[in-house]
Amino acid sequence: MARLSAFNFQKWIDEHKHLLKPPVGNQQVWEDADLMVTVVGGPNKRTDYHDDPVEEFFYQLKGDMVLKLYEGGEFYDVPIREGDIFLLPPHVRHSPQRPQEGSIGLVIEPKRPEGAHDAIEWFCFGCGSLVHRAELLLESIVRDLPPVYQAFYADEQARTCPNCGEIHPGKEPPEGWVKL
């Protein structure tokens, strides 16, 4: 068995910087640990909200981000500035927005309990109603989420609001939706 040792995290970030921008945007530090330790780079804007069955810890290493939340029937923004930390409780719908080029955040969350499902939700930009919810067993953020997004973006029926009929734009949020 190999001996445990530390490594320089900034060097790791520098070596993986090419993966911390679109279209990938994030990279897990370890694939085989009980914690999912993910480094996320900007720019990144998304239109979905994540329903996570476990807590998420956010540490904004470089630049600023906004965590859009939907809680108790209300949408609101939580700015997370460079150097800030934030602990998100389980099942609070959230949409991380990192519009700044070169921004870097660290997100730490436990692996899911056996059988626990994550969900990705999209809400109507017109009336605020839930447009679509996709549930999944999440093991790797990098590997498991992209197919869920691609399926939603490709399906106009899934993107049609059942309340007002507006078509969700898919990948691109409306102009001005993200404000730092």
From Swiss-Prot:
Where Fe cation 1 binds, per the record, is at H50, E56, H94
Question: Which cofactor is essential here?
Answer: Fe(2+)
Binding sites annotated in the UniProt record for O2: R46
Instruction: Return the Gene3D superfamilies for the record.
Output: Jelly Rolls (2.60.120.10)
Give the reaction(s) catalysed: 3-hydroxyanthranilate + O2 = (2Z,4Z)-2-amino-3-carboxymuconate 6-semialdehyde
Q: Which residues bind Fe cation 2?
A: C124, C127, C161, C164
Which UniProt keywords are listed?
A: Dioxygenase, Iron, Metal-binding, Oxidoreductase, Pyridine nucleotide biosynthesis
The source's domain of life comes to: Bacteria
Q: What is its EC number?
A: 1.13.11.6
Q: List GO BP terms, alphabetically.
A: anthranilate metabolic process; L-tryptophan catabolic process; NAD biosynthetic process; quinolinate biosynthetic process
> Hey, which pathway is this one from?
Cofactor biosynthesis; NAD(+) biosynthesis; quinolinate from L-kynurenine: step 3/3
Q: What class of enzyme is it?
A: oxidoreductase
**Chain sites annotated for binding substrate:** E56, R98, E109
**GO molecular function (one):** 3-hydroxyanthranilate 3,4-dioxygenase activity
Q: Which InterPro entries match?
A: 3hydroanth_dOase (IPR010329), RmlC-like_jellyroll (IPR014710), RmlC_Cupin_sf (IPR011051)
Q: What does this protein do?
A: Catalyzes the oxidative ring opening of 3-hydroxyanthranilate to 2-amino-3-carboxymuconate semialdehyde, which spontaneously cyclizes to quinolinate.
Kindly state the subunit structure of this protein.
Homodimer.
Query: What protein family does this chain belong to?
Result: Belongs to the 3-HAO family.
Q: What is this protein called?
A: 3-hydroxyanthranilate 3,4-dioxygenase
Q: Which organism is it from?
A: Ruegeria pomeroyi (strain ATCC 700808 / DSM 15171 / DSS-3)
Task: Give me the gene this protein comes from.
Answer: nbaC
